C-alpha cells in the first residue's frame, strides 16, 4: 500500500512533468535568447537543447545554439549545429558565412573555401549584405592561404621573416596549430624564449600532449621561474595537466615527483636562509642522507 509520503512525492513529480510539457519550444527560445543577452552561455545552451527536443527541425534554433557553443569554446559542436542548419535550410546564407569564419580561425582554409562554394552552389546569397560578407571573407581566406605557404618557406630560412608572417597569419587564423608551432620554433631560434613559451602554452590548451606539458614545466620552473614567481607554480600546473590527460604517463609521474621534492626542499631552504641558518640551508638542499641529494651543489 502506498504511503502518504510516496503519494505526495509522485503527485509533485507529475505536476513538474505537466509544467515542463506546457513550456513550448518558443518559450525555451525566449529563455535561451535572454540568457545569451546576459552572457549566460551555459544557461542558453540548456534552453536551446530543450527547444531542439520539442522542435528538432527548426534551423534557426540550431543556428542560434551554435553561437552558445562557440562562446563556450565548443567549436566542433558549433560546426555540427551549422551543418544541421543548412541541412534544413540550404539557402540560409548566414550559416555558411559563420561556418567559413570558424574554419578560417581554425586554419582550415580549404574547408572554408569549400563552404563558401557550397553557399554559392545553393544560391544562399539571398541578401546583398551576405554577398559582400562572403566576398570579404573569401579574400581573407585567400590571403591566409598565401601567408601559410610563405610561412612554410620562411620557417626553414629566416626566423625573423617566419615570426613576421606568423604574426600576420595568426591575426586571421588565431587557432591555427601549424602557424603557432612555427612561430614558437622561430621565436626560440631568435632567442625569444618568453614568446615561444607563450605560444607553447596556448598550444597545450588547444592540442594537449605529454611532451609539450613536460617542456613547459621544465622551462617554467627551472628557467623562467624565480622565487615566489607564478612561473614555478605554472611549472607544477603543467605536470598536473599532463597527469590529468594521461594518469599513467611515466615521464610526467617521474617529473612531477621530482619537481614536488625539489620545490619542497627549496621552500625549506629559503626559510632557513631568511633566518641566516646557512648550515641548515645546505642540509635542506642536499636532502636526507639515506635518500641521496635533493639538489646537486
Residue ranges, per PLM feature:
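Canonical tetratricopeptide repeat
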Residues: 64, 98, 130-133, 137, ...
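Canonical positions in the second alpha-helix
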Residues: 51, 84-85, 119-122, 168-169, ...
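Residue-level recognition of tetratricopeptide repeat
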Residues: 24, 58, 92, 109, ...
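Register position in tetratricopeptide repeats
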Residues: 37, 71, 105, 140, ...
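Alpha-helical segment of the N-proximal tetratricopeptide repeat
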Residues: 24-54, 146-173, 182, 265-294
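Structural marker of alpha-solenoid helical repeat scaffolds
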Residues: 54, 88, 122-126, 172, ...
Amino acid at each position: 500500500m502506498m504511503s502518504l509520503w510516496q503519494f505526495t512525492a509522485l503527485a509533485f513529480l507529475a505536476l513538474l512533468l505537466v509544467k515542463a510539457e506546457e513550456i513550448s519550444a518558443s518559450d525555451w527560445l525566449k529563455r535561451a535568447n535572454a540568457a545569451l543577452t546576459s552572457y549566460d552561455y551555459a544557461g542558453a545552451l540548456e534552453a536551446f537543447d530543450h527547444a531542439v527536443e520539442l522542435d528538432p527541425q527548426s534551423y534557426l534554433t540550431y543556428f542560434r545554439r551554435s553561437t552558445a557553443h562557440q562562446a563556450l569554446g565548443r567549436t566542433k559542436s558549433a560546426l555540427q549545429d551549422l551543418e544541421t542548419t543548412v541541412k534544413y535550410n540550404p539557402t540560409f546564407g548566414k550559416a555558411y558565412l559563420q561556418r567559413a569564419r570558424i574554419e578560417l580561425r581554425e586554419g582550415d582554409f580549404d574547408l572554408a573555401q569549400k563552404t563558401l562554394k557550397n553557399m554559392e552552389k545553393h544560391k544562399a546569397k539571398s541578401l546583398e549584405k551576405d554577398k559582400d560578407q562572403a566576398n570579404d571573407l573569401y579574400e581573407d581566406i585567400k590571403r591566409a592561404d598565401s601567408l601559410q605557404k610563405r610561412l612554410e618557406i620562411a620557417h626553414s630560412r629566416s626566423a625573423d621573416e617566419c615570426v613576421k608572417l606568423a604574426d600576420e597569419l595568426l591575426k586571421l587564423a588565431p587557432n591555427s596549430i601549424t602557424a603557432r608551432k612555427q612561430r614558437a620554433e622561430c621565436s626560440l631560434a631568435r632567442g625569444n624564449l618568453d614568446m615561444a613559451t607563450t605560444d607553447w602554452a596556448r598550444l597545450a590548451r588547444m592540442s594537449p600532449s605529454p611532451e609539450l606539458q613536460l617542456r613547459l614545466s621544465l622551462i617554467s620552473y627551472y628557467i623562467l621561474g624565480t622565487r615566489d614567481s607564478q612561473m614555478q607554480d605554472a611549472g607544477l600546473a603543467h605536470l598536473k595537466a599532463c597527469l590529468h590527460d594521461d594518469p599513467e604517463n611515466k615521464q610526467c609521474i617521474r617529473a612531477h615527483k621530482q619537481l614536488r621534492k625539489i620545490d619542497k626542499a627549496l621552500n625549506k631552504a629559503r626559510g632557513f636562509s631568511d633566518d641566516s641558518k646557512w648550515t641548515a640551508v645546505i642540509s635542506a638542499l642536499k636532502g636526507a642522507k639515506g635518500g641521496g641529494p635533493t639538489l646537486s651543489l
